[in-house]
């Protein structure tokens, strides 16, 4: 329900004014995303595609990602639930200037600011990249391990994922992450699907079973 309302708002609010003079064909979204950040990323992708602005918006989001990476305090600011309307508008203006004043992105930031969703920006950036990659025939997969994997293991994992129905006719883009907290095993994420065979996950399931009343 909220997802549908969010997309309607994207089309009815500031973006609608910028697109009112164009009768663009319906945009085909390359992959379905879930979660609130996925909903907003899809709305931004659709708006940018209608404006023939995908490459520009992609570049602007890359700059925005750099802002968050280089200035960790920005994430803390946008996550502050006590920001006033004026504060949020200031944040939107500063972020807009940082990425070069991209009109589509500025309107989008205004919408999510009005909806108190500025904290979702990092997730939206990631999901937007997933959409762009999918439109190019790229299928992203992230493999998380407790320690760095050797080349032979990486090649085996890559071959297994590339040959799966998740990738199909697309081209696999493999991202590797290391997280010692999973203790061992792997967590494989392909698009919106997650396969968790980590030791930490198994321990959590065991603890759950042991805590259940007999």
From Swiss-Prot:
One of its GO terms (cellular component) is proton-transporting ATP synthase complex. It comes from the Eukaryota. It is found in: Mitochondrion inner membrane. Residues 1-24 form a transit peptide. It is a peripheral membrane protein. Keywords: ATP synthesis, CF(0), Hydrogen ion transport, Ion transport, Membrane, Mitochondrion, Mitochondrion inner membrane, Transit peptide, Transport. It holds the Pfam family OSCP. GO terms for biological process: proton motive force-driven mitochondrial ATP synthesis. One of its GO terms (molecular function) is proton-transporting ATP synthase activity, rotational mechanism. Belongs to the ATPase delta chain family. Mitochondrial membrane ATP synthase (F(1)F(0) ATP synthase or Complex V) produces ATP from ADP in the presence of a proton gradient across the membrane which is generated by electron transport complexes of the respiratory chain. F-type ATP synthases consist of two structural domains, F(1) - containing the extramembraneous catalytic core, and F(0) - containing the membrane proton channel, linked together by a central stalk and a peripheral stalk. F-type ATP synthases have 2 components, the catalytic core F(1) and the membrane-embedded component F(0), linked together by a central stalk and a peripheral stalk. The central stalk, also called rotor shaft, is often seen as part of F(1). The peripheral stalk is seen as part of F(0). F(0) contains the membrane channel next to the rotor. F-type ATP synthases form dimers but each monomer functions independently in ATP generation. This is ATP synthase subunit 5, mitochondrial. It comes from Yarrowia lipolytica (strain CLIB 122 / E 150).
């Amino acid at each position: 329900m909220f997802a549908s309302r969010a997309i309607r708002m994207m089309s009815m609010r500031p973006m609608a004014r910028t697109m009112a003079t164009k009768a663009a064909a319906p945009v085909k979204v390359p992959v379905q995303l879930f979660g609130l950040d996925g909903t907003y990323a899809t709305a931004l992708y659709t708006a940018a595609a209608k404006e023939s602005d995908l490459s520009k918006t992609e570049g602007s989001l890359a700059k925005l990602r750099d802002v968050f990476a280089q200035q960790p305090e920005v994430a803390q600011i946008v996550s502050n639930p006590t920001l006033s309307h004026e504060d949020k508008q200031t944040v939107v203006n500063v972020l807009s200037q940082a990425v070069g004043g991209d009109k589509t992105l500025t309107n989008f930031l205004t919408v999510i600011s009005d909806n108190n969703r500025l904290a979702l920006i990092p997730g939206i950036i990631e999901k937007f990249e997933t959409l762009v990659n999918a439109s190019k025939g790229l299928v992203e997969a992230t493999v998380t391990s407790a320690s760095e994997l050797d080349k032979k293991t990486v090649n085996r994992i890559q071959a297994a994922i590339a040959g799966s129905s998740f990738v199909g006719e697309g081209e696999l883009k493999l991202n590797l992450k290391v997280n010692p907290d999973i203790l061992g095993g792997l967590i494989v994420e392909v698009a919106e699907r997650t396969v968790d065979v980590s030791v930490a996950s198994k321990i959590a399931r065991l603890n759950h079973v042991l805590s259940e009343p007999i």
